[in-house]
Amino acid sequence: MPGNTFVPMAIVDADAIVLNSPSKSFNTAGLQTANIICSDPAMRRRIDRAININEVCDVNPFGPVALIAAYNESEQWLDELNGYLWGNYTALCDFVAQHLLKWEVMPLEGTYLAWVDVSLCCDNVAVYCEQLIQEAKVWLNPGTMYGPQSGEGYLRINLACPRSRLLEALQRIANIKA
């Protein structure tokens, strides 16, 4: 996202073992494809043994091709997607600033999931999220799903959707009493 730079862990620590996947960035979760980057040959052999012991790493035949195409040939598409997601984030921030004054949107660093502090409008975010489901027909996740202490007072909004759908959901939320 603008103002943030991705720093690969392998640059920070050459001995790091990096596990990643194109599934979120390139919407390829159905291919169940990921990769492991490990520079130490002995450790790599141990990893290979461990993941093959129960045959848990059967490769989908389309997965490696999709992974290579995603990482090598999709930079323009990813840049455009990130631009759209950033537009959704700014639309969220603008809407909140005008209509949901007790919400505070946290800075977005590198994801399509917005973290929103709603502690000023409710005492119990899980109850508030249930109210949003019942009255606004909008399903948001309470922050405590992602950490009982660190998530307290927050909810999470998925920005990977059409902007019209995001704005419609926000308008429905603004129309109910908190």
Regions of interest found by a model, annotated:
Residues R45-N52, A70-C93, V125:
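Structural signature of PLP-dependent enzymes
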Residues P41-A42, P61-E80, F95-L100, V118-L120:
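Amphipathic alpha-helix from the class-I
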Residues Q131-W139, Y146-A178:
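PLP-dependent enzyme catalytic core of the Aspartate aminotransferase-like
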Residues A10-I11, A34-D40:
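Short beta-strand-to-turn element immediately C-terminal to the catalytic PLP-Schiff-base lysine
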Residues C38, A42-F62:
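Active-site C-terminal subdomain of aminotransferase-like
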Residues P61-P64, I68, G83-C93, V105-V118:
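Conserved glycine-rich beta-strand-loop-beta hairpin in the small C-terminal domain of fold type I
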